[in-house]
Amino acid sequence: MADRLVRAMAAGGGIRLVAVTTTETTRMARERHQLSFLASALLGRAMTAGLLLASSMKVAHGRVTLRTQSDGLLKGLSVDAGRDGRVRGYVGNPSLELDLVGDPASFDFKQALGTGYLNVMRDEGQGPPYSSTVELVSGCIGEDVASYLLHSEQTPSAVFVGEHIDSSGIRCSGGVLVQVLPKAAREPALVALLEDRCREITGFSQRLEACQGDLHSLLRDVFPDLDPEVLADEQAEQPVEFFCPCTRERSRGALALLGAEELADMIEKDNGAELTCHFCGEVYRFSGEDLAALIEALPRSA
């Protein structure tokens, strides 16, 4: 089943909810980067969180970037997610495995990420991007992103991300975002109800798997008291996918920036060049002849 994102409201428009499945997206990332199960789980959670954050952007081409800077064995991760539902990402140590595959609930995310910071950058496509950094709270991604929303955007939020991974692979991956909008934040009873409900939620990954991709059902299961209603407009649902815009032509342009002298050195030493996209793992190879042609195409100095 293709991954999807659903937007909903509750409490007369005072509470915003977003749910997303990233099962195929995480599988693609694992295949592209040859990820261990632990690395797959963490990158899947980060891509899920990125899509949830990007879902509220005002412009279709808006993007959110998540990066961790920490001392953990994963050596950091980076995710680029768009309002258009396209997401990509990578981790520093793709082969990291700390726990038995047979017990995915015991994945030690805290040890994998370690202590450090989460940086979130929002780019609306006009003006300078907005960037904010918060300390990692748990390393489980959901609580870390919720901390960012509270401290950097002053929006009380809960972020639930999860997955089910066993020896056969990635069974499911996804998440839910719930936010109290400004007008509802002035209603203490509603805020208290939501806080109590969020504290009571357990076994999110099991709920995610049980819904079998039905995000409407997932929202009703997680927040039955809120009676969430999926938005009626055309933006209520959208597809989600792992996608990277890198191309051979862009790689050629990156090589051209090195200049004729550096390119000539590559021809002499390696008779070519190889560029690998960090975000998707795609490899672009250029022969010595390709580099020579690139040198010829460079503008001559006056």
From Swiss-Prot:
One of its GO terms (biological process) is protein refolding. One of its GO terms (molecular function) is protein folding chaperone. Belongs to the HSP33 family. This is 33 kDa chaperonin. Under oxidizing conditions two disulfide bonds are formed involving the reactive cysteines. Under reducing conditions zinc is bound to the reactive cysteines and the protein is inactive. Keywords: Chaperone, Cytoplasm, Disulfide bond, Redox-active center, Zinc. The lineage of its organism: Bacteria, Bacillati, Cyanobacteriota, Cyanophyceae, Synechococcales. Gene3D superfamilies: Hsp33 domain, HSP33 redox switch-like. Pfam families: HSP33 (PF01430).
